[in-house]
A protein has these predicted regions:
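Conserved hydrophobic beta-strands of the Rossmann-like cofactor-binding core
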Residues: 18-19, 68
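Active-site loop-to-helix junction immediately N-terminal to the catalytic Tyr of the SDR YXXXK motif
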Residues: 33, 79-87
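Substrate-binding pocket helix/loop in short-chain dehydrogenase/reductase
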Residues: 29-30, 34-39
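A glycine-rich helix->loop->beta "capping" turn
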Residues: 8-18, 26
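Residue(s) in the substrate-gating loop at a strand-loop-helix junction
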Residues: 73
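SDR active-site lid
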Residues: 105-179
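Active-site helix of classical SDR
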Residues: 53, 89
Length: 202
């Protein structure tokens, strides 16, 4: 499908903006989550973004202009319990886009890259993820289930999706790489760096 996107972009006068947003989350302790649910989260959250970003970059680097945006998560900067596959995949998206940014600076400076790291956003991701996995519930132990329930509660209390959309539009105007719609994500990332510097545990 890379070739198809490139051909379509050329037929339409070129691809100017590409926003990659893919996510499923199936919480639980890492040793309780079945491997097929690990695989699903990595496939959608990481490989889905890789395919989209790579196809967009092929088209954009040919023209020398464009802006590719990938939506990661606050979980791409700060880890939390009960979300190991999701956290791993979202960290991978951040690493991908940082590498892409370095590459574009050297090979195609007219093409911009941004990574979006939202905190909790009020979406039906939890319900949709169960449907994609084809299960009614995670089938977790009680301690693991309590963490999963807390994840869902946090999502339900999250910000509006419009918050993320507005931040992406701002980034397209400014060319900013790091896009953190909610300040608590930056605070969490700063705390992580300080813990690394101090040699303290997460």
């Amino acid at each position: 499908h890379h070739a198809g996107l490139v051909t379509a972009a050329e037929d339409l006068g070129g691809l100017s903006v590409s926003v990659q947003n893919a996510g499923v989350v199936l919480p639980g302790f890492s040793w309780e989550i079945p491997l097929d649910r690990w695989q699903l989260q990595i496939d959608v959250n990481y490989w889905g973004v890789v395919h989209g970003v790579r196809a967009a970059l092929v088209a954009m680097t040919r023209r020398g202009t464009g802006h590719v945006v990938a939506v990661s998560s606050g979980a791409g900067l700060v880890a939390m319990p009960g979300l190991a596959p999701y956290v791993s995949s979202k960290h991978a998206v951040v690493g991908l886009m940082e590498s892409v940014r370095h590459e574009l600076a050297r090979a195609a400076p007219g093409v911009r890259a941004s990574v979006v790291c939202p905190g909790n956003i009020d979406t039906p991701i939890a319900e949709h993820s169960l449907a994609v996995a084809g299960v009614a519930d995670e089938g977790l132990s009680a301690p693991s289930q309590s963490v999963a329930d807390a994840v869902r509660a946090g999502v339900a209390e999250g910000a509006s999706p419009q918050t993320v959309a507005n931040s992406i539009l701002d980034a397209l105007g400014s060319g900013r790489f790091w896009v953190l719609p909610q300040p608590e994500v930056a605070i969490g990332a700063l705390d992580r760096v300080q813990r690394i510097l101090d040699g303290r545990d997460p």
